[in-house]
């Protein structure tokens, strides 16, 4: 997964 604007893992 990649980093989203919230700083979390998009894959999560």
Curated annotation (Swiss-Prot):
- Primary location class: secreted
**One GO cellular component term:** extracellular region
GO MF terms held by the record: toxin activity
Tissue expression per record? Expressed by the venom gland.
Its domain of life reads: Eukaryota
Which compartments is it annotated to reside in?
Secreted
Q: Which residues form a coiled coil?
A: none
Q: Which UniProt keywords apply?
A: Disulfide bond, Neurotoxin, Secreted, Toxin
Query: Quick check: keyword Amino-acid biosynthesis in the entry?
Result: no
Does the record carry RNA-binding as a key word? Answer: no
Q: Where is the signal peptide?
A: none
Task: Briefly state the modifications made to the protein after translation.
Answer: Contains 3 disulfide bonds.
Miscellaneous comment as given in the Swiss-Prot or TrEMBL entry: Shows similarity with the venom allergen 5 from wasps. This similarity may explain why patients with allergies to centipede venom also display allergic reaction to wasp, honey bee and/or yellow jacket venom.
What's this protein's family per the entry?
A: Belongs to the CRISP family. Venom allergen 5-like subfamily.
Return the protein name.
Answer: Scolopendra 20466.84 Da toxin
Task: Say which species the protein is native to.
Answer: Scolopendra viridicornis nigra (Brazilian giant centipede)
